[in-house]
């Protein structure tokens, strides 16, 4: 992909095996986050093919790519900070627990059924991350490390096949980073998740990633 004649990512080619914890490293400006934006439909590639489980998802809309099975977190936390912890997770559940606008406005039986299912699933995910006791708090009131966990929980709520983590340890102290490493391993094992990780913390990368690709200018 190019921006104004500047080639941002060129001849990038990786294959990630199911259940693998894969690291993507390189200096700032090498194109790591741009690759995430290509994989998730924020940008459309000028050339090349992106496949998920053999399905060509190149150029699809972000929402369709998410429905196909790719979810992500962001380098800068992007929670809905004026919503509760539980409601943040429920946002991620709407793709798989839909009800129509009319059902929501008129509060028809399906609306209450789906909302109950989403409440239960959201609490299950929050419990996995030890966030169930904070379910009714505003997301903005969580400590930084727990906000990172909440962002991962919200991504998992979309039921992805591939989870993209963009610098999840950014801004964390050593204790929080160690806890995050344990969390990422746990997520991979519990959910049989395939994970692609961007990170500058080499201790974290070398501690959990099974394979690495290095980007350079």
Annotate each language-model stretch with its function:
Residues 1-217:
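Glycine-rich phosphate-binding loops of nucleotide-dependent enzymes
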């Amino acid at each position: 992909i190019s921006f104004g004649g500047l080639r941002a990512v060129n001849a990038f080619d990786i294959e990630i095996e199911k259940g693998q914890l894969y690291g993507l490293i390189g200096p700032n400006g090498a194109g790591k986050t741009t690759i995430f934006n290509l994989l998730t439909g924020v940008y459309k590639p000028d050339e090349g093919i992106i496949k998920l489980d053999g399905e060509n998802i190149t150029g699809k809309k972000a929402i369709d790519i998410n429905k196909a099975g790719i979810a992500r977190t962001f380098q800068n936390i992007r929670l809905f900070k004026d919503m509760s912890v539980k409601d943040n997770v429920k946002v991620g559940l709407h793709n798989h627990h839909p009800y129509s606008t009319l059902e929501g406005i008129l509060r028809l039986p399906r609306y209450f059924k789906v909302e109950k299912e989403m409440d239960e699933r959201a609490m299950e995910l929050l419990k996995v991350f030890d966030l169930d006791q904070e379910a009714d708090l505003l997301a903005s009131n969580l400590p930084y490390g727990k906000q990172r966990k909440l962002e991962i929980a919200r991504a998992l709520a979309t039921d992805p096949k591939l989870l993209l983590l963009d610098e999840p340890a950014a801004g964390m102290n050593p204790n929080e980073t160690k806890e995050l490493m344990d969390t990422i391993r746990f997520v991979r094992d519990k959910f049989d998740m395939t994970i692609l990780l961007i990170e500058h913390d080499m201790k974290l990368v070398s501690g959990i990633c099974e394979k690495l690709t290095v980007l350079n200018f």
